[in-house]
């Protein structure tokens, strides 16, 4: 569901100063708000969890809340403002910037700020973890979480997102399989898998990579996508399907939609939500229908 926003005149910018990129681009973001004639108040986070406290305490005073940090900062603010508060605008201040890339928000704040201020308000489902935290894009177990965990820190500092490409390459070559016990709305499915994604969005990376057909973010459902390649050839075929958005019958792909999910694995596997690492499985996930309101570029204006 998209709603045309009212004029945004006053915003709160929550900045994570631990984000190296966020520190570097903050002056550009502030200039973009100033050039747009928007009053912007900045509050810096001081510890993990502080962004949620800031949002809960101050959001009601503003027309919109913007985040400038990593995907963890976005998760905190979305969790704090679920079903309430003003819309959230995401500025890419981290390394992976999964949410910004998926929403097709430019990484340059000089472009992102005016596009979001003149864009749409999108009311969408959010995913909810067992501890109450929300996510916008999806939860992954296995290959994608390993890709994030194995990206070398020194390369992330130097090369940013490209460090994850190296982590992904290493994870694909290893192709660590696990026994998956997936419960969807009370029904149990068991498979051997290399990765499972519980997705709210059907495509990521500026719509470059898709997970499956019919995955939308405002239908009150999440979508489990299980990937089970037996060889490097299988993995390459799946990747080609994801790039072409061609999801015909494939023995290495398995899909189930639902509202409540339980992921159990043998052995325990690392997990991630919107690019942020989580404790190892088991993991519980559910949908929170139409819980989030985000600012997105108006279609056709991301360039």
Predicted regions and their residues:
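Catalytic core of DAGKc-family lipid kinases
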Residues: 5, 14, 24, 32, ...
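ATP/NTP phosphate-donor binding region
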Residues: 1-65, 301-303
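N-terminal glycine-rich "phosphate-gripper" loop used for MgATP/nucleotide binding
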Residues: 67-72
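Short Gly/Thr/Asp-enriched flexible loops that form oxyanion-binding sites at enzyme active sites
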Residues: 73-84
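Glycine-rich phosphate/pyrophosphate-binding beta-alpha loops
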Residues: 140, 197-213, 277
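ATP/nucleoside-binding phosphotransfer catalytic cores, i.e., glycine-rich phosphate-binding loops
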Residues: 45, 184, 216, 226-303
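Gly/Ser/Thr-rich active-site loops/lids in small-molecule metabolic enzymes
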Residues: 155-162, 204-207, 213-233
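A generic structural signal for short beta-strands and their flanking turns/coil linkers
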Residues: 176-178, 192-194, 218-223, 257-261
């Amino acid at each position: 569901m998209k709603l045309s926003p009212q004029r945004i005149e006053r915003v709160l910018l929550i900045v994570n100063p631990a984000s190296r990129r966020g520190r570097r681009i903050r002056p550009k973001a502030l200039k973009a708000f100033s050039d747009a004639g928007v009053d912007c108040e900045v509050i810096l986070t001081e510890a993990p969890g502080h962004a949620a406290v800031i949002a809960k305490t101050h959001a009601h005073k503003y027309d919109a809340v913007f985040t400038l940090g990593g995907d963890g900062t976005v998760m905190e603010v979305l969790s704090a403002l679920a079903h309430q508060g003003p819309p959230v605008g995401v500025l890419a201040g981290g390394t992976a910037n999964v949410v910004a890339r998926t929403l097709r928000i430019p990484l340059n704040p000089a472009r992102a700020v005016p596009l979001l201020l003149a864009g749409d308000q999108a009311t969408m489902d959010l995913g909810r973890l067992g501890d109450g935290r929300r996510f916008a894009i999806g939860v992954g177990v296995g290959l994608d979480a390993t890709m994030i965990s194995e990206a070398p820190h020194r390369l992330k500092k130097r090369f940013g997102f490209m460090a994850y490409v190296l982590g992904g390459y290493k994870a694909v070559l290893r192709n660590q399989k696990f026994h998956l016990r997936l419960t969807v709305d009370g029904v149990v499915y068991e498979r051997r898998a290399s990765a499972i994604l519980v997705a709210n969005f059907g495509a990521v990376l500026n719509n470059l990579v898709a997970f499956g057909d019919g995955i939308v973010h405002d239908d009150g459902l999440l979508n489990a996508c299980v990937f089970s390649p037996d060889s490097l050839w299988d993995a390459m075929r799946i990747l080609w399907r994801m790039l072409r958005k061609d999801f015909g019958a494939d023995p290495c792909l398995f899909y189930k939609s639902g509202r409540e999910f339980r992921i159990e694995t043998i052995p325990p596997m690392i997990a991630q939500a919107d690019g942020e690492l989580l404790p190892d499985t088991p993991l519980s996930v559910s949908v929170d229908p139409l819980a989030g309101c985000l600012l997105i570029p108006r279609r056709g204006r991301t360039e």
